[in-house]
């Protein structure tokens, strides 16, 4: 959503890929983001991606599609691999087949700090070894390396942003920041009296999603494609977040 708004502000014609005519998010997008034209497609179906690219003829493609909740990836590992990992390959292959010298497409892949997993150094950089510890992280590693492979093998302008946690009021309440803020609001209104959390000492690098999408856009405006870590450089404990809320 933030990315669509930034691109619209920059004067882009914005298309959004959506799976199925009856997708429950379609009405919300049409109402709140009328400048976005929805195009049907599926990261599990190469032919639909080719058709979508042929119709839209984009100059830039941003892939934020994923099964993005780490805990869910353990329960749906195959689906996570198929969408979050192989979906990147299908999209890059579609770009390779549809694009060309007459329409060079620039591609952004949303990689994740979950790829680092078992951390070997702090802070992590673009050169830190990857050691994912979840199906989600593993799928992101596949997508990340596939992006590099298509850049080096086919000369595509393809780059990855290795994003640390990016939060906003639009975040799903299954994520800890929104779980806390939602619970605090409900407690204030007398709708509940407590919130159950996991490890309060866990530390995260939390940034604002609205800032991070600007970094995504800037990455596709450079002369040469490359991969970049996108983070604040500061970590805070969950307990700090709870106290502030």
What residue spans do the PLM features occupy?
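Conserved metal-phosphate-binding beta-hairpin within the catalytic cores
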Residues: 230
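N-terminal Rossmann-like NAD(P)+-binding domain of SDR-like oxidoreductases, especially those catalyzing
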Residues: 1-166, 210, 220, 243
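His-Asp-centered acyl/peptidyl-transfer active-site segments
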Residues: 224-226
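NAD(P)-dependent short-chain dehydrogenase/reductase
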Residues: 119-123, 133, 145-221, 233-245
């Amino acid at each position: 959503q933030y990315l669509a708004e930034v691109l619209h502000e920059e004067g882009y014609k914005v298309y959004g890929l959506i799976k199925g005519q009856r997708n429950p998010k379609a009405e919300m997008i049409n109402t709140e983001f009328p400048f976005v034209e929805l195009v049907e497609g599926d990261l599990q179906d190469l032919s639909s991606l080719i058709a979508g690219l042929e119709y839209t003829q984009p100059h830039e493609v941003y892939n934020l599609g994923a099964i993005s909740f780490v805990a869910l990836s353990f329960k749906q590992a195959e689906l996570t691999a198929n969408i979050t990992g192989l979906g990147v390959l299908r999209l890059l292959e579609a770009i390779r087949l549809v694009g060309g010298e007459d329409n060079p497409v620039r591609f952004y892949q949303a990689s994740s700090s979950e790829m680092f997993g078992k951390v070997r150094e702090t802070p992590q950089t673009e050169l830190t070894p990857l050691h994912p510890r979840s199906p989600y992280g593993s799928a992101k590693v596949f997508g990340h390396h596939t992006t590099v492979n298509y850049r080096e093998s086919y000369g595509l302008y393809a780059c990855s942003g290795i994003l640390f946690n990016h939060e906003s009021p639009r975040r799903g309440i299954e994520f800890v920041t929104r779980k806390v803020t939602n619970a605090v609001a409900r407690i204030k209104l007398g709708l509940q009296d407590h919130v159950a959390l996991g490890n309060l000492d866990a530390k995260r690098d939390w940034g604002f999603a609205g800032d991070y999408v600007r970094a995504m856009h800037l990455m596709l405006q450079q002369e040469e494609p490359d991969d970049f870590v996108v983070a604040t450089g500061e970590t805070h404990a969950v307990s700090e977040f709870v106290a502030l809320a």
